[in-house]
Amino acid sequence: MILLQQVWLPLPNRPSTSPPMSVAARSTRTLQLPPQKAFGQEASLPLAGEEDLAKRGEPDSALEELCKPLFCKLCNVTLNSAQQAQAHYQGKNHGKKLRNYYAANSCPPPARVSSVVAEPVATPLVPVPPQVGSCKPGGRVILATENDYCKLCDASFSSPAVAQAHYQGKNHAKRLRLAEAQSHSFSDSAEAGQRRTRKEGSEFKMVATRRNMNPVQSNSGPYFNARSRQRIPRDLAMCVTPSGQFYCSMCNVGAGEEVEFRQHLESKQHKSKVSEQRYRSEMENLGYVQ
């Protein structure tokens, strides 16, 4: 028992013994090396993130210029109100074009991502921005309806609600009134042109005097009547000139044929002149002479 106590008692004093200083120094040196490497790696990561953010910030600023509150230059759509703008920017067509825009302006992705990103760009149904020249147009044709496109205003819509809001807006109503006014003015000008041709052909057309083919009678004198052998009506006897042409002194209009001269006598111009002459003569008879 005594021997055991002597052996057991020195045992608690052993932990006070420390290892040599060289061993502690080695352990600390080995522990200090990995944090330095990790610290260098961690310091390089934020720099790479800032570069990526700087690269992504450029297309975002350009995108703000394309997507205005009332005009989407990316989709070439004019918006009339805030509700219509919200419906357009939340629509599928704008989302597809937005994805294509990011795919066209983003940094060159790795080989695996390029195959995935290239698929939506090459789809024939989605129109590609003019910056991307590698996309080929598809052979499928989609017919646009009133809910998709307004030919009068040259505007496309992403949903029927947006189309209905456009057709009820002020811009569409203004364009519609202008189109109707232009169509009415064109029809009025066409009718006026037809009336002018009729008047020129019937009332105001001067017929050239026909010369007599007989050389003996043509030299018979200045008062030779070419219609001497023809029967001249009594009511038109005072309207025939010595050269054989019918003449209206009131309207200062001449005609070579009896039919054309009678058409002039039945025209509105001649009748208005006659009524004006009668009114003047009546006023002169009554003593109202200016």
Swiss-Prot record:
Q: Where is the composition biased (Basic and acidic residues)?
A: 266-283
Where does this protein chiefly localize? Answer: nucleus
Molecular function (GO) terms listed? Answer: RNA binding; zinc ion binding
Q: Which Gene3D superfamilies match?
A: Classic Zinc Finger (3.30.160.60)
Q: What tissue specificity is annotated for this entry?
A: Constitutively expressed in brain and testis. Also expressed in lung, kidney and spleen after whole body gamma irradiation.
Which keywords has UniProt assigned to this entry? Apoptosis, DNA damage, Growth regulation, Metal-binding, Nucleus, Protein transport, Repeat, RNA-binding, Translocation, Transport, Zinc, Zinc-finger
Q: How does it assemble?
A: Interacts with dsRNA.
UniProt name for this protein: Zinc finger matrin-type protein 3
**Name of the gene this protein is made from:** Zmat3
